[in-house]
Amino acid sequence: MVSISDFEPVIPRARLGFIIPASNRMVEPQVQHFCPDDVVPHFARAGITNRHSAPLSELKQRITYQAELLGDSKVNVVVLQCTGTSMGDGPEAEEEVVKAMAEASGAEALSTARCVTSALAAIRAKKLVFVSESKEVDHSKKERYLRGQGYQLLKSKGMGLPGSDYSCTTPSDYWFQAMAEMRDPEAEAY
């Protein structure tokens, strides 16, 4: 007779939880493509951009609920994967939401804002050329966040894409050319 004790459990090395905007169609295929075979990504969608846009304090309950559900998947870490949302209301608001995500999920929590600043710290980059997909009003919030974290923006431009449909379909060559036009010899990162 078959017994569960006769079999080794199938347990991945890590489970990564991502809370992404409902409109985002890029993160899932990209993360799945780049994850090693023994690392499993899990995704939860939340209305946090476009018609759902609101201050982070108003989105906190939605985000925290999705973090709680990802916790049911036994994720090792949960990430709020939305740069504009995580930077938009400053580091204090971002910190509050990240703490709530950790409590709700029972896992370590991060945001893309924190991931960006951690990556820049790892390469000791403080002088940046910064380009985002955002219209000026939202781009300026990201600029404030970065400057508030001690970064010098040598050049900065919001490309003004009209929404997620464009963000999800704009080819990488567009971004390469946009960055090439803003080249700065003093830049430590782009």
Feature annotation, model-predicted:
Residues 20-25, 82-91, 116, 133-138:
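Gly/Ser/Thr-rich loops at beta-strand to alpha-helix junctions
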Residues 60-73, 176-188:
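Short, well-structured alpha-helical segments in soluble
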Residues 1-65, 136-174:
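N-terminal glycine-rich anion-binding loop in soluble enzyme alpha/beta folds
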Residues 67-114:
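Glycine/small-residue-rich loop that forms an oxyanion/phosphate-binding "nest" at active or ligand-binding sites
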Residues 111-115, 170-181:
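Active-site glycine-rich loop that binds ribose-phosphate moieties when present
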Residues 14-18, 107, 127, 188:
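Short active-site oxyanion
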Residues 97-165:
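Conserved beta-alpha
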Residues 76-81, 129-131, 187-190:
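Periplasmic-binding protein-like
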